[in-house]
Structure formats: structure tokens, C-alpha cells
Amino acid sequence: MPEYPTALGASSKDAITLLGHDLANDVMGEVGFGELAFWLATQRRPTPGETRVFEAVLAALADHGYTPTAIISRLAHLSAPDSVQGALAAGLLAGGSRFLGVTEDCGRFLHDVLEDAGALPTDDAGWDALALETVRRQREAKKFVPGLGHHVHKDGDPRTPRLMAIAAEEGITGPHLALFAAIGRVHPEVLGKTLPLNGAGVCGAALADLGLPLELLRAFALLARTAGLIGQLAEELRHPVANDIFLSVDLNNRPVDPDPYEPPPVGQDSL
């Protein structure tokens, strides 16, 4: 008979174990949800400091107002009010490279730079030099630096200094956060303007410094946003706006002449 080993949940007639512990007696009422999420992903119990940083990330990413993920969830619930799971899933599926995906993109970007750097800097001057080289390379390649800039918080994202402070208080400021902070200091020399380090980016740096799998960084952002979407749906039930959003489009659309698609000439980049 085939076997399917797992260190996660397992059940017998009289007990349920999770991560090798009795679920009812050792986990329920003893382990917070954020701590448990970290533990499930890494199969090691986080320290109190790691838990504090991780839960600060979850709080930072839970909700950011009427973003596309929130609007889509509300509209999906308007269309199918009998399917709360569909409304939640619709919002989560909207998480991507523009919204929520920056957490993963920034964590991976910083990690790749650090892997290529060899010996890591030991002081701010060294980090600034590495950051300057990194920003210049991105500029020459005509690429953005993930985590740099925000369409609303143009003068500074309040989540960024707070998360950096929490990580420092817990002794968890690692190379990813150090490089990200240095990028914030030196990028004006290359770009000629000052952009904020955004909250999604600093969350990616913090998650990477916690040693969490890079492949799951977006999953943690989605975990956080799940709570936010539940809040959006709860508010929609009491104070609905989705129908107004729908009607604002439905009542204000206007017919225009067709705009036939023309493929680009052969040899040019496709759309």
C-alpha cells in the first residue's frame, strides 16, 4: 500500500495531532493564528520576536482600502450573494504583480542581489555601495526596483519605518532589510528624485529575513489580505456600495465606434 507521510495534521479515533503536538491540548488556546501560520509553513515554532515581526507583516498587508481586490470581492458578492467563498476567492485571485505581488517581487529581488554579491557588507557605507550599484543596474536595464514608490504615499509609507523598527527591536534586521533600507537612502543619486520605500516591499524584505520560503511570500500576503477581504465583505453586508459601483459604470457607459485590432508588423515586439 502507498504511504503519504506528513508532519502536519493527522487524526486517529481519539486524537488529532498537528506538527507533532496534540491539537486540542497543546495548540488550541495556546498558539496564536499568526504563530501557527509561520509554524505550518516552516515546520518549526517561531520565537516570540519572529512571531511579532510576522504578525506585523500580516497587519500591514491586511487591508488598504478600496483596492481592486476589495472592489472585486464586493462586486462578486453583489453578483452571487450566496457564495461568500466565491467573493473571497475573486479578491484573492486579483492579487498579482500590481497589488499584493510586490511583497514577493521585492523579497526575491533583494535575495537575488544578495546571492550575487558574495561577501555581504558590514557597515552602512558598504550597504549603500551595494544599493547604489543595484539601482544603477536596474536603471540601465530600464527596470523598476521592486518596493520603490507608491501611488498614494508619495512622501513616505508609514508602514515601512514601523516594520523596520519592530524588526530592529526584535533583533531580526537581516541582509534583506539592510539592503532595502540602503536602496531608500541612495536611489535619489541615480533617479534624481526621492521615492518612498513602500509597505509591500518592506514586508517582502522582512519575510525574507525571517527565513520563510521565497516561493510562499505572495501566499503570506494573500493570507493577510484574506482577513481584510472578510472585513470588506462584512462591511458590504451592513453598508453596501457594490451596487453603486456597478450602476456608476452601467449608467455612464457610452457607445463608440469599433476600433479594429491591427497586429504589429512582423519583427516588432508583440502586444
Regions found by a protein language model. Name each.
Residues 1-271:
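Non-transmembrane, aqueous-exposed alpha-helical and coiled segments at domain scale
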